[in-house]
Amino acid sequence: MRVTRRHFFFSFFFLFLFALIFSSCALEKAQTLSSQNSGGNNSQGTTTSEIVGNDITPLSLNNSSVTVPLEGGKEAILLVVSADPLSSVQSFQLTTPQNPKTLTKFLSADTEEDTEEDLHMLLRNLESEIPEGTPLAESQTKFLTRYLKIGDSRDFKVIKSFTSKDEYTVVTATLVYEHEDFEVFLDSRDLQRLSSSEIQEIFDNFAQVLPKEFEFFGEPSDIDKNSKFTVLLTQEVNKMGELYNALVTGWFFGIDLFASQVYPASNGMEIFYGMVPDPNGEVGPATHDLIMKENIIPSYLVHELQHLISFGQHVIKNKTMSEANWLNEDISHLIEDIHPPRTDSEEIYSENYMVETGLENPSRVSTFLADIDRVCFLGCSAGLQERGGGYLFLRYAYEMIEFGILENLEEFLQRLLDGKQIGLNNLKYALFGDESADQALSDLVGLFALTIYFAGSDELSDPLFSIKGINLRGASSDNRGTMLNGPAVISATQFPLTGILEGFSMAYVKVSGQDIANQGGELTLEVSDSKRFKAYLIQ
């Protein structure tokens, strides 16, 4: 019954949506980027705050094509949305009466490799190899830490790479912070990298976040029976970044919950690891001190805690697989928004506690928007661009629940971690209460794509076309100077124009009024599979 109500709502909502009229806003200087164009050539796609047109028309793709008559002299945006749960590569083509060539065979999968190695995927792959019935760690940690006080030390194991469950380094770390829910150890070699006052401030703020994160996602498992989880800050995390030529900020690894007789690198406790400040690059990639202490550490604390909770819910409690890496990362980025603003930690207890985005999220979203037609943001990989888009979608869905479009905020968040499904099935179950709700997800993705285009416009007051936690056309207060300028728009300068979209992705194609007139006053859109596409004309 719940899914039926939502399907009725989406049908009603889109009828309402298509009647809305939007106005354009001021043009800001555009940033140039490459986007795929006809014949595999590169056209110039641009991110810009310009809003073209004032009408939205849904396009019916019966028989995999639609011809649209256009008013001469008016610019148009054609929004093409791929909503393919199989994550396959689909093609579309724009033709005109002057250039009517059609595809005899749509392009096959020929996607670019993401050159950024997905390091967390290596850990998730190792976790997926843990056999069912592997013995959990015995309750030894409570004995080891029972008599420790601030300033005391103990040894920990830290893995040497993301490809082995067995090789590790032993580090000695000092207890620097204690709380009823967690304890913090700092590598004894790194005690000068954080002052006692900085430690106090960082983890006092983190402690205030915990009740909300536990409320949303549940509490961590407690295999060591000490009612706490452990945070280990160590230069070994920084060194991992040096090893992989990347910035590795932290990790959780599920083997720590299992017996060390099976996995020698296990610490036998709920633990995650984080990097230490290193502005001079002495032990790994150099990190700006302000960004490290105000952005990175607060972000990875809530981020890695979500991974720890998720693993406990899926694997320990529900006896299922660990969450798909792409969704696991997207959820962790969403939970970063719970971290309180730097100047007002009480904000998390108000109704507006997610009014601001986490400090590290705008830069991720920026990479997504800049290459939006090349990014599969749901169900594919967990690269930086994909995570930027996946996070933004979860943020949007979260706000749609706040507005009453989707039901039950707490159920949505709890289902994400406590369900027995993973990946897209888990996402559909969390959103709609039904893991087979493909059409409902497709409808929401279409609305999301329209929102990305219109969000940030001063002309729109309807909250349905905004993402209040992040301005998609404005400066971000993220200590990085990130400027978001809307999604990349491809200018169609020749026809036929062919595009490729993978899984859940979208492309914004702009046609000038002069080109429309020169091309006979109409466009034909053809797609490789009408069941996988949605399309909208904006004029």
PLM features: residue spans?
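Long, charge-dense tracts
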Residues: G53-G133
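Alpha-helical scaffold elements that line and support the substrate/ligand-binding pocket
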Residues: E304-F311, S332, E386-E407
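Juxtacatalytic substrate-recognition/specificity segment
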Residues: E178-A324, I331, I335, R342-T343
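Sec-dependent bacterial lipoprotein signal peptides
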Residues: M1-S23
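Bacterial Sec-dependent N-terminal signal peptides
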Residues: A19-N54
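Beta/coil-rich, acidic/histidine-enriched accessory regions frequently appended to metallopeptidases
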Residues: T46-S65, P69-E71, Q421-Q539
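Acidic/His/Gly-enriched intrinsically disordered linker/tail segments
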Residues: N295, S299-Y300, N318-G390, E399-M400, ...
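Acidic/polar low-complexity interaction segments
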Residues: V81, F106-Y177, D181-L191
